[in-house]
């Protein structure tokens, strides 16, 4: 008989935009039962965000002692910020620590390079577990990469069960720092091995970087800046010449794979417009890789707040029905935090989180490492 226990899990996510921590409570059996609880967001200060970004692209086997020390300092601060955010979140929602079965702690990605055999997330899981007296699951990507997978995306299994009641062919699009797509057919009895998922291209990370480097803003609110700009088609075409876009899925992307240097001579509004058009084009390319036309495309992630980008996506893929996650009463800012809460429970149950058509592994694999508190 299957273990039908329901677990109360807390998920923590800091994405490639590196703007803060998403927190979410989930009640689940680690399989098809999913109940979304409260969620919240804890922003990073501008100075800490800049410190994190300063160590992006670093190789996992750094030999420079000064750089090593700096990353350890940033990791300790990052871990402490997660600890503070959790305490504030639990107090606000009147949740006692001893009621939480497990924490799914993604950490902050510094570098993702599956071709070299690693994906590096900072965050001291053992320290966090001991501070909170709650077991923590992290290092979700390593087992997949060791076994020949891309280590990303990891959220498709959660997307699949979250949308189980939508008896349609579904395309779930996460507009995060990097955009990714999950496709499955709930009309038929889809085997988990038939879930298709892959990274589509850069998204909010590039747009936010451009805006923060050229203004005192953290992001282009609602895409108002981009809306005023003129797209530079040649730059968009140059971006799209990257081999990544002709590579067949499954595939994954590091935030540092693309640079905004091509835009440096542009006005801020024109650069923003150009990047938005580029992102929309990458999604069109990605959706054309799907085995069938989806009945509905569901947008989640921070990019869905960019009304200009959403309009462009609608124009590019106008033959598809596009809805926001809020149409289903899901907070689109918290989907990935919910997902890592879910994945942590699957680790406790030794259930797989990656599959041949999501990351390229030969057989379904479990993922994550359990850090027990002392």
Regions found by a protein language model. Give the residues of each.
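Short glycine-rich phosphate-binding loop at a beta-alpha junction
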Residues: 97-106, 292-303
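Glycine-rich phosphate-binding/hydrolytic loop that grips phosphoryl groups
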Residues: 14, 18-19, 277, 323-374
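Glycine-rich phosphate-binding loop and adjoining helix at the ATP-binding site
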Residues: 99-157
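Short beta-strand-loop/turn "lid" adjacent to the catalytic site in phosphate-handling enzymes
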Residues: 63-123
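A contiguous, well-structured pocket-lining segment that forms one wall/lid of small-molecule binding clefts
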Residues: 216-296, 307-320
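Glycine-rich nucleotide/cofactor/substrate-binding loop typically near the N-terminus or early
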Residues: 27-84, 89
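Glycine-rich phosphate-binding loop plus the immediately following alpha-helix
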Residues: 21-26, 38-55, 131, 137-164, ...
């Amino acid at each position: 008989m299957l273990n039908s226990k329901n677990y109360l899990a807390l998920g923590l996510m800091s994405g490639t935009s590196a703007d803060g921590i998403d927190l979410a409570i989930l009640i689940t059996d680690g399989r098809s039962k999913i109940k979304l609880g409260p969620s919240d967001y804890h922003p990073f200060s501008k100075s800490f965000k800049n410190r994190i970004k300063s160590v992006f692209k670093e190789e996992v086997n750094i030999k420079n002692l000064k750089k090593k020390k700096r990353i350890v300092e940033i990791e300790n601060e990052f871990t402490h910020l997660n600890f503070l955010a959790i305490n504030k979140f639990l107090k606000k929602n009147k949740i006692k620590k001893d009621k939480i079965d497990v924490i799914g702690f993604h950490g902050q990605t510094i570098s993702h390079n599956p071709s070299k055999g690693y994906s590096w997330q900072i965050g001291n899981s053992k320290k966090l577990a001991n501070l909170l007296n709650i077991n923590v699951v992290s290092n979700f990507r390593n087992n997949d990469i060791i076994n020949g997978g891309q280590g990303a995306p990891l959220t498709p299994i959660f997307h699949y069960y979250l949308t189980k009641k939508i008896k349609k062919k579904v395309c779930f699009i996460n507009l995060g720092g990097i955009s990714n797509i999950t496709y499955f057919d709930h009309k038929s009895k889809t085997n988990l091995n038939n879930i298709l998922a892959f990274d589509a291209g850069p998204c909010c990370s590039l747009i936010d970087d451009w805006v923060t480097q050229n203004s005192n803003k953290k992001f282009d609110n609602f895409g108002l800046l981009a809306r005023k700009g003129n797209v530079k088609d040649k730059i968009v075409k140059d971006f799209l010449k990257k081999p990544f876009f002709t590579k067949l899925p499954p595939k994954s992307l590091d935030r540092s794979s693309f640079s905004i240097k091509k835009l440096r001579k542009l006005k801020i509004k024109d650069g923003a417009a150009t990047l938005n058009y580029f992102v929309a084009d990458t999604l069109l390319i990605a959706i054309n890789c799907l085995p069938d036309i989806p009945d509905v495309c569901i947008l989640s992630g921070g990019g869905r707040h960019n009304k200009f980008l959403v309009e462009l996506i609608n124009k590019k893929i106008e033959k598809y029905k596009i809805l926001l996650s809020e149409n289903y009463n899901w907070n689109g800012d918290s989907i990935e935090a919910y997902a890592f809460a879910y994945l942590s429970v699957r680790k406790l149950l030794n259930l797989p989180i990656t599959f041949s058509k999501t990351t390229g592994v030969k057989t379904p694999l479990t993922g994550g490492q359990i850090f027990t508190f002392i």
